[in-house]
Design a protein with these regions (language model features):
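Metal-dependent active-site segment of extracytoplasmic phospho-/sulfohydrolases and closely related
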Residues: 27, 47, 240-283, 397, ...
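Structural recognition of the beta-strand scaffold that forms the well-ordered cores
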Residues: 26-29, 36, 58-62, 75, ...
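Short, structured active-site-proximal loop/turn typified by the sulfatase FGly-forming signature C/S-X-P-X-R
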Residues: 36-84, 125-128
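Mature N-terminal segment immediately following signal peptide/propeptide cleavage
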Residues: 18-38, 49, 57
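Active-site neighborhoods of enzymes that stabilize oxyanions during catalysis
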Residues: 112, 297-424
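A long, amphipathic alpha-helix that forms part
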Residues: 18-20, 36, 191-215, 220-261, ...
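Bacterial Sec-dependent N-terminal signal peptides
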Residues: 1-21
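His/Asp/Glu-rich, glycine-adjacent segments
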Residues: 81-228
Length: 428
């Protein structure tokens, strides 16, 4: 953890009553949570508004490069940037091979200790539901990971059962907590999903009493990608996510554990609307530096991991190709060049990006990056995106419960959250 992260962590600790170590910590992520989704009076988020008023509220949480689900969720449980924890994107860059739909699913991708590991090694029980990069973690006692088959025609919930811990736990949850899960009752993006996840969490907390529980609520991500940040669908999804959080709070109250629990709600990233897409690999393909399809000859390739395009060279020290790329970027017409800034290696290292990246392109707000290699460089299209380097898509944080006094703080870095959770649990 960096010195700055230590300082910020001390600031978070100051918001907790001195000497208070709650017995339980629950970390909930609402995928794509923005501050406006809590603060806007038109947003149907009464539970989050109540928690924000009565607990600790951090207006802005600045994420890691890129601000995307898998690297960000891994930072939340490690306190480290991608350069250290080694989960760089949602899907790994496979050096001009077809990435298909492979993601950083497995916990052994993480190169540093997690809060699950630290808690488990101290003899504390842990639980997790649908957390990215948690599959096969030996440190999560009760685990239903985010994992899926590349064969979308299969029964996805049956597919993941052998990867759940302990074996049979998902059957137990279906029988006693959430009902049968299938493509209708638990479809990604469905309004039913977050509520059923909350029911599973409540069952695990009631019956097994894990000291640390991590929960990923995903529905709000889908509507924002498809429709942007102002849709009616998002209002419905936000109400669903808020209700899921509310049922967890209610369950803690009814089981007399709210006064011994800290509940932290945050996002992995925020969102920004876009009206144009930009495809930098089209330039490389036209210049003969990249094959039109994955698997061919190449010298350079941009990878849109989130909404920043990271440049990889087939030979990392190929200065000639790097000069060609720079010359290509410098010669672009103004109507294309104005859509992005060049991020140099020094800034990428400082922010903790993949060390193999030689430079990156960060678009202006209103533009979304793609990995397309052919077609138009710029297209008119609308939706929502995230994955900036400069914090335009920051998320927010609320902490509520035992020892948490009403307080406001403007900004923290995402790397400060995991050390604070360990401090709450009394783990040095």
């Amino acid at each position: 953890m960096t010195l700055m992260a230590c300082v910020i962590c001390l600031g978070l600790q100051a918001q907790t009553s001195l000497g208070v170590h709650p017995k339980y910590v629950v970390l909930i992520t609402i995928d794509g949570l923005r501050a406006e989704m809590v603060d806007d009076p038109l947003m149907p988020s009464p539970f989050l508004k109540m928690m924000s008023q009565e607990g600790l509220r951090i207006s802005k949480v600045i994420g890691v490069p890129p601000a995307a689900s898998y690297p960000s969720h891994t930072t939340l449980v490690t306190g480290e940037v991608p350069a250290r924890h080694r989960v760089f994107y949602n899907r790994p860059f496979l050096w001009n091979k077809d990435t298909a739909r492979i993601s950083y699913w497995y916990a052994d991708s993480i190169a540093v200790p997690t809060i699950w590991q630290r808690a488990h090694e101290r003899g504390l029980k842990t639980a997790s539901l649908f957390w990215p990069t948690s599959t096969n973690s030996p440190y999560i006692d009760y685990n239903v990971p985010e994992f899926w088959s590349l064969d979308y025609s299969c029964d996805q919930m049956e597919y993941i059962k052998p990867s759940c811990t302990p074996l049979g736990i998902l059957d137990e949850l279906e029988q006693n907590a959430c009902g049968k899960l299938d493509t209708i009752t638990y479809q990604a993006g469905s309004l039913q999903r977050d509520g059923r996840t909350a029911a599973m969490a409540n069952y695990l907390m009631n019956h097994y009493q894990p000291r640390l529980t991590t929960i990923h609520l995903i529905t709000t991500d889908y509507s924002q990608h498809a429709l942007g940040t102002q849709s009616q669908q998002l209002l419905q999804d936000m109400a669903s996510a808020d209700h899921a959080v509310g049922t967890i709070i209610e369950n803690l109250r009814l089981t007399h554990r709210l006064d011994s629990t800290v509940v932290i709600v945050t996002g992995d990233h925020g969102f920004c609307d876009y009206s144009q897409t930009l495809s930098p690999n089209v330039w490389l393909t036209k210049a003969g530096m990249l094959s039109p399809q994955p698997g061919g000859e190449w010298k350079a390739c941009f990878y849109a991991g989130g909404n920043t395009c990271f440049l990889y060279l087939r030979k990392g020290n190929d200065r000639k190709t790097l000069r060609r790329v720079r010359q290509m970027l410098d010669s672009l017409p103004n109507d294309q060049r104005r859509l992005f800034r060049i991020v140099e290696k020094e800034e990428l290292v400082e922010k903790g990006a993949d060390p193999a990246v030689v430079l990156a392109l960060e678009p202006i707000v209103g533009v979304a990056m793609t990995n397309n290699r052919t077609g138009e460089v710029v297209e008119q299209r609308r939706g929502g995106t995230h994955g900036f380097l400069s914090g335009q898509d920051a998320t927010t944080l609320i902490a509520y419960g035992a020892g948490i006094s009403p307080a406001r703080q403007d900004v923290i870095r995402q790397t400060a959250i995991a050390p604070w959770i360990l401090q709450l649990l009394g783990i040095d």
